[in-house]
Amino acid sequence: MGAYSLSDLSADVQRLVDVHDDIRKRTRAIEPYLRRWMDAPDLTDAQRAPCDGRACGHLLHTAADGSFFIISVVFPPGTSSGVHYHGAWGVIGVLAGVDEETKYSRAEGPAEPGAGESCELAQTAKLHFPPGSVTYLLPPEQGYHRVRAVGEEAGVSLHILGGTPETHPHLLCHPESRTLVDFPMAALLDQVPPGT
C-alpha cells in the first residue's frame, strides 16, 4: 500500500462532507485524515513557496460539487494575514514554521457579517501552532482571526475550506476604516497545479 496522498485525502474529505452536515462534527471527522496526510505530505517545492516573497495560497484541489477546496498557504517569516473573517468551515494543519493565531469575537456576539459592517473586535485568544498542529474555523463564533509566521522559518500549512475559492466567504478587517471589505480567496491564490 502506497503513501496516503493528497488525492486520498481529497476523497476522504468528500465522503465526510457528504455524511456530516454539522460543521463541528465534520471538522473533527476530517482531522485524523489530515493528520495521516501530514505524516508524509506530498507537496512540491513550489507548493511550499511564497509568491514573490509575499504570503499566498496554492490551489491543490477543488471538489467537483463545490463543497470544499484545499490549498497550501505560505507565510514568509514575520508576515501576517491581517485580521479577517472566514464565513465557512475549515480545518488547518501546520506543516512547517510556527503559526501564531490570534482569535477575535464581535462585541455584539456571533453573527454572519457582511461587507461594510464594523469590525470592532475583542481579542479572545493568542495561540501558537508548531508543525503537526491542527486547528479549525467554525463560523460565525470562531470565524475571525489573524495568522502570523513567527520565528525564522516560513509558515506552511494545509487548509481544507468549505466552498470554492470563488464562493468561500472571506472578509478583511480594513485597518484604517475598521470596516469589513470583501477579500475573495481566489485573489490570494497563485494557482500552482498539483504535481508541478
Which functions belong to the PLM regions below?
Residues 1-41:
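N-terminal leader/capping segments at the start of a protein or of a new domain
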Residues 82-84, 101-102, 127, 137, ...:
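Short beta-strand His + acidic residue motifs that chelate non-heme Fe in jelly-roll/DSBH
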Residues 91-93, 152-167:
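A short hydrophobic beta-strand segment most commonly corresponding to one strand
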Residues 106-144, 182, 186:
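Short acidic-glycine-tyrosine-enriched beta hairpin
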